[in-house]
Amino acid sequence: MSGQEKSDKSVDMWSFLRCLGYLSSFNLLVAVCLGMYVRWEQTSEPMILVLFILGLFVSAIACILYYYFSMESASLSLFHLWFGFLQGLLCFLNSPSLEDEIKEQVTNYLLLSSVSIRTLWALTERLCANPKYKPVVITSSELLELLGFGVASISLVFDKSLAMIALTFALTALIIDLRMKSPLALPNLACFSVIAAVTFFQSLKIQTNPFALSCYLGRLICEPLLDVYFSSLTATERWKQFLSAGRLWRRFSLFPLALVELLFFVVCAFKLGNLKDWYLVIPGFCIFGLLWILCHMVFLVTLWCFHTKLSECQKMWAAQRLQTLNLDRIMASRGMRHFCLISERLVLFCLMSTIILGAVSWQVANGLFMSVFLVVLPLESLAHGLFHELGNGLGGTCVGYAVVIPTCYSSADGQPVLLPPGQVQELHSTSTLNAVQRLFSHHLIQTFGCDYSTSLSLETLLVKLRSFLELCTAEGPRHDTYILYYSGHTLPSGDWTLAGGDYLRMKQILDMWREQNSSFSSRLILVLDTENSAPWVKAVRKVEGMYVAVQGAKLSPVQDAEGQDAPRLGDFTSEWVKYNCDPESGVQWSERGRVISAIYGVSKPWSDYALHLPTGSDVAKHWKTHFPKTTYPLVAVANWCCGLNLLWLCSVCLRCVRRLKLSWFPPSILDTGQGIKLVRS
C-alpha cells in the first residue's frame, strides 16, 4: 500500500469516527429535548419549559462559539455541563404516567442508541485509530457532566439531594479508579452497579428513569472501562499528575480523605439507633469499629510516610533532571519498591476492615450510608492500586563495587609486574574507571567503592569483598542486586592476579556469596573485562542454588595489524557502558568480525529470580519504625497473609518453562530489570 493510500485510509477512518461521535451527541440532544417536552406536556410545570428553552439557548450559544469563534473548549464545556444537568433532570423528573407515552418511549430508544453509538465509537477508536493516551486523572468533559448531574440533584428534597451528591462523588472516584487501572477497579464497578440498581434508589423512595440513568452512566464509564484493557501507559505515566505534584498539595489531599473516612464512620454509627437487634449490633460495631480505627490510623500514617519519601525523590529528581533521569528510576534507587510492597498489604487490611464494618453496619433504608460507602471503597482501592503498581513496577535496589588494576601485567608464573611509566597511559585504565563510575551514576547504583591500585593484596580484597557482599539498605533488607566489576590481568583459568603472586578464584567469591546470601534471594552480577573470562562464564552455568551471572568478553587477534589497533583491557568496558547508558549509541554486538565480542553466562536458577518480597520480619521492622504500639497486633495478620500462595502449582510450571527456555535458547540480550543488559555476540 502506498503512502498516499495509507493517508487516505487514515482520513476516512478519522471522518468515520467523527461521524459516530456527532451522531451519538445528536441523538442525546434530541432525546433530552423530547424528554423535557414530554414532562412539560404531562405536568404543565412552567419551570420545566423555562429549563427546556434555556437548554436550547445554551446549545445554540455553544454551536456559535464552536463554529464562528473557534472557542472549542468553552463551547464543549457549556455543552457537557448543561447536558449533565439535563440528563439529571430526565432521571429525577419521572412518573408512572410517562411509561405509556409514545414520545417517552421514543426518548428512551434515543437514549439507548446514544450510549450504544458512544460505546461503538470508543471501541472503534481504540481498535483502529491508535489513540494517544494522556496521563489524566479525569477529563474536563467528565468532570463537567458530573457537576451538572450533581446540580440537577438539588431538585430533590435535602436528605435525598445529599445522598445523590455523595453518589456523584462516588462515581467520580470510580472513574478515576478505572483510569488508574487499580486491581480492584472492576470489583468496585460491580459493587457500585449492584448497590445503585438494587437498593440505593429504593432507599430514597424516588422513581428514576432507568434509560436516562443508564445512558448517563454508560457514556461516562465506557471510555475508562475500555482503557483498563487498551491503555498502554505505564504505572508512573498514569500516576504522573499525582507523583509530580507539589509536597504541600499532596499532604493537603490527606485532609479531605480523612474527613470522608470520618464521615463514613459516623454514618456507620447510625446503625446503633436500631435497637431491634441491639445484642448483635452493639458488640459487632464496637469490635469491628475498633479494628477499623486501628487500621485507618495505619492507613493515614502510611500515606504520610509515602509523601515524605516521594518528596525526597522529587528533590533528587529536580537536582538530576539535566541528566535525563526519570522519577521511577530514582524511586527504585531510594527503596520505594520495598516500602510500597509492605504498604500495599497494610492498605489491603484497611480496605477489608472498611468492607467488614460496612457489612456489619449495613442500613437498607439509609441512602447516604450507601453513597458514602461507595465513595470510600474506590478511594482506598486507589491507594492500594498505587502501592501495588509501584511495588510491582519499580526496580530493586542495587549496589556496585569496582576493582581496576591498571599498571601491571602477568608474567608466566602469575606474578604481577609493574610497567614502565610510558606504557601506563596506553592501558587507559583511568578512562575505564570513569566509564564504570558513569554506569553506576547513570543507573543510580549505590557505589560501595572503586579500587584503583597495583598493590591490592588477596587478604585486603577478601575483606573488602566480604564487606561489600554483606551490605544492606538503609531500611534494613539486603540489596536486590550486587554488581562486582573487575578489570585487570588473569590466569588462563580466569582467576584474578593480585599483588604478591596471589590470585582470587571464582569459588572464593561464590563461597562468600553463599554465606552472606543464605537466607535471602539477592543476585550477584560479575562483570569481567579480562583476557580470560570465558572459563568463569562456563563455570557459572553449572552453579545451583544461587542467582549469579557473569558478563565477560573475548579479545580476538587483529587480522590486519597495520590498519587496526589490537584490543586492550578497557575497550570492552567502554563499549558495554556506552551500550547500557545510551540506547542510541549504535553499538551492535551481533555484527561479524568484531575484535571485542561479548559473552555471558547465568546460573541454573537465574530465571526463577524475583525481586525480594517483604518477609514477616521486614513487616515487623517496618511497623516498629513508622506506627504506634497500639497497632502491633495486626502484625500477626500481616505475617499470615504473607505466607499465602494460592497459585503455587501454576508458579512451579512457569518456573520450569522459564528454566528450559533460558538454558536451551538463551537470548542475545538479557535484561536484568535494573537498566543493565547482559549481552553476547
Curated annotation (Swiss-Prot):
Subcellular localization(s) per the UniProt record: Nucleus membrane
Superkingdom of the source species: Eukaryota
GO MF annotation list: sodium channel regulator activity
Keywords, alphabetical: Glycoprotein, Membrane, Nucleus, Transmembrane, Transmembrane helix
Gene Ontology, cellular component aspect: nuclear membrane
Residues carrying sugar: N517
Membrane topology: Multi-pass membrane protein
Bilayer-crossing regions: 16-36, 47-67, 73-93, 135-155, 156-176, 184-204, 252-272, 281-301, 346-365
Main function: Plays a key role in maintaining the cardiac electrical stability by modulating cell surface expression of SCN5A.
Similarity comment text for this entry: Belongs to the TMEM168 family.
Stated name of the protein: Transmembrane protein 168-A
Organism: Danio rerio
Gene: tmem168a
